[in-house]
Design a protein with these regions (language model features):
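A conserved mid-protein helix/loop that constitutes part of the nucleotide-sugar donor-binding site
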Residues: 40-44, 199-215, 233, 324
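Donor nucleotide-sugar binding/catalytic pocket of nucleotide-sugar-dependent glycosyltransferases
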Residues: 139-182, 187
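Conserved donor-binding/catalytic core segment of Leloir-type glycosyltransferases
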Residues: 182-204, 210-214, 224
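Nucleotide-activated donor-binding/catalytic signature segment of Leloir-type glycosyltransferases, i.e.
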Residues: 233-260, 265
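Acidic donor-binding loop of glycosyltransferase active sites
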Residues: 261-280, 295
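Short hydrophobic beta-strand element within catalytic cores of glycosyltransferases
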Residues: 287-292, 296-299
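Conserved acidic donor-binding segment of nucleotide-sugar-dependent glycosyltransferases
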Residues: 310-323, 332-338
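A short, well-ordered alpha-helix in the C-terminal region of glycosyltransferases
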Residues: 332, 339-354, 360
Length: 369
C-alpha cells in the first residue's frame, strides 16, 4: 500500500552520489539527551551513515549562549584539522548556520547540507537572526534538506531544497514491531497516548487534548503522557487534577514502544502558529513511530503531518485545533471498534512497508553527501 509521496521519495534516486560514500561527515547537532523528534531524526541519520560506512563525527551544542557556541566552533575546527580527508558538514538545525559557515572556511570542507524541520522554517522572517540564516543558506555549496514537502514549500521563498523524509533506525524499528507483537490483548481500559518534549507541553496541545478527553464522559479512558526532560511545575499541576491522566518521564525505548503498542489511539495535537513565536509540525516523527507499533493516530489539524499517515486509513486529523474538534475526532474513532481495528492493521502495514529502514541509509547518502 505504500503509494504516498514519502514512500516514493524513499525509493527514488537512491543511487545518486552513491560513489561518494567515502566522504567524511562532521555533524553539528543542536542538542543531545533532550529527546524529541529532531534528536531522533539526527540519530537516525547517524545510523544511516554508519550503515553506509561513512565516517561520521558529531559535535553537540548542549547549552545556549555565546560561550557554548564558541566551544562548538573550537571543537569542530579541532576535528576538521585532525584529518586531511574531504569532509561534508551536515548541519542539524539552521540556527547553527553561523557556526557552520565559519567551519566551512577550513580547507578540508567540501560543502554542507542543512536540515530543516518545521517552526525553524516559518518563524518570523523579519528578525535579524532569521535574515542572516536565510542569507547563509543561499550561499554556494549549501544544500537545504527539508523533512517534508510541506517544509520544502515553506522554504521555497528562501531557497531551493531537496526532501529527506524521516525514518527509523533498524534497532528502533524492530523494537516497535516487537512491542506490537508482545501486546496481544487490549485491556478493558481504553488507553490514549501522546508523547513530546515536556517543556513544549502547551505547544503540543496538551490542554486541548485533556479537555477533549474530558468531553468523552467515559470512565474507561486513560491518557498517558510520555515525555523527555524535566516536567514543568504547571504541567505537573495540570496532570494531578485528573485521576485518569498519568505522566511517564524518561522511558527507555523498549518502555516507550510498549506504551505506543498498548494504546487504542496515539494523539498529537500540536498547535500551529507563525510569527515571532512560531510553532508547528514539519512532519511528526512520533506519528510514524506509533503506527509502526500498530497504533492508529490522530494527527495535528494543520502543518506537515499529512506525509506521516494515511488520512482515513491509518489515522485522522481534526478539522481545526479546537478542543471540540479534537473531541469529535476521538469519539468518532473510539465509537467504531471495527474501524479502529482496521486502522490498527493498516497502520502497521503501511508504516512498516513505506518506511522500511533497509533502503533509508542509501537515501540519506544520496541526499546529504
Amino acid at each position: 500500500m505504500p503509494s504516498d509521496a514519502a514512500s516514493s521519495l524513499r525509493h527514488a534516486d537512491t543511487d545518486e552520489n552513491v560513489f561518494r560514500r567515502n566522504e567524511r561527515v562532521l555533524l553539528l547537532a543542536p542538542s543531545q539527551g533532550l529527546g524529541g523528534g529532531i534528536e531522533r531524526y539526527i540519530g537516525t541519520v547517524e545510523w544511516a551513515f554508519a550503515d553506509q560506512k561513512v565516517t561520521s563525527q558529531r559535535v553537540d551544542l548542549n547549552r545556549s549562549g555565546l560561550r557554548a557556541h564558541l566551544k562548538m566552533l573550537a571543537d569542530g575546527r579541532m576535528l576538521l584539522r585532525a584529518s586531511p580527508e574531504r569532509t561534508r558538514l551536515v548541519v542539524g538545525h539552521r540556527a547553527l548556520m553561523p557556526i557552520a559557515t565559519l567551519l566551512a572556511r577550513e580547507p578540508t570542507v567540501s560543502g554542507m547540507s542543512v536540515l530543516c524541520y518545521g517552526d525553524d522554517v516559518w518563524n518570523e522572517r523579519l528578525r535579524p537572526r532569521r535574515r542572516i540564516e536565510r542569507a547563509l543558506m543561499r550561499r554556494p555549496g549549501v544544500r537545504a534538506v527539508a523533512i517534508s514537502g510541506f517544509t520544502a514549500g515553506t522554504l521555497a521563498s528562501d531557497c531551493q531544497s531537496t526532501i529527506l523524509p524521516p525514518a527509523l533506525s533498524q534497532k528502533w524499528f524492530e523494537t516497535l514491531v516487537a512491542a506490537s507483537a508482545a501486546v496481544q490483548d487490549l485491556t478493558p481500559v481504553t488507553q490514549l497516548v501522546t508523547a513530546f518534549r515536556l517543556e513544549d507541553w502547551r505547544n503540543k496541545g496538551l490542554p486541548q487534548l485533556i479537555e477533549a478527553v474530558r468531553a468523552q464522559h467515559r470512565k474507561d479512558i486513560r491518557l498517558t503522557i510520555c515525555g523527555s526532560g524535566e516536567p514543568p511545575p504547571d504541567l505537573l499541576r495540570l496532570v494531578s487534577t485528573h485521576d485518569w491522566c498519568s505522566l511517564r518521564v524518561g522511558l527507555t525505548d523498549s518502555e516507550l514502544a510498549i506504551q505506543f503498542a498498548s494504546a487504542a489511539l496515539f494523539v498529537l495535537a500540536t498547535r500551529t502558529r507563525i510569527g515571532r513565536h512560531a510553532n508547528g509540525e514539519g512532519f511528526g516523527l512520533v506519528l510514524l513511530e506509533a503506527q509502526v507499533a500498530g497504533t492508529p493516530v490522530i494527527a495535528p489539524a494543520h502543518g506537515g503531518s499529512s506525509d506521516a499517515y494515511m488520512d482515513g486509513v491509518t489515522g485522522v486529523a481534526p478539522v481545526n485545533e479546537s478542543a471540540e474538534a479534537l473531541a469529535t475526532a476521538i469519539s468518532e474513532m473510539l465509537e467504531d471498534p471495527a474501524r479502529l481495528a482496521s486502522m490498527r492493521r493498516h497502520a502497521a502495514q503501511w508504516a512498516r512497508e513505506s518506511f522500511a529502514p533497509e533502503s533509508y541509509p542509501r537515501l540519506v547518502a544520496s541526499k546529504l553527501l
